[in-house]
UniProtKB/Swiss-Prot annotation:
Enzyme class: isomerase
Keyword tags: Carbohydrate metabolism, Cytoplasm, Isomerase, Rhamnose metabolism
Binding site for substrate: 18, 41, 76-77
Protein name stated in the entry: L-rhamnose mutarotase
HAMAP family: L_rham_rotase
Domain of life (superkingdom): Bacteria
Amino acid sequence: METIAFRMVLNPGMREEYERRHAQIWPELVDALHNAGVRDYRIFFDPDSNHLFAILTRNSHHTMDELPQLDVMRKWWDYMADIMHTGPDHTPVQQPLEPVFHLNSLS
């Protein structure tokens, strides 16, 4: 298993809409993420900066690099493009984050 983190940027005033859309995430998108090896995916919001912080755990044999070729992934990105920073192809602008601390368990 591997954990990665990245930052995205939400457009101002779009938190509720972002949460609403994710509360109704398409089952076929959930299936695609699971099939690609995603085991846990959490997104946090910083209201002061409109930054979204994503933490994703995936298996070591993940196929996440293939997700952009899936119709459901492209459609989701198109659906989300009006409320967050994206590239010209509607891919979310993501800034990878580097780990600086990890506490697995208390002894």
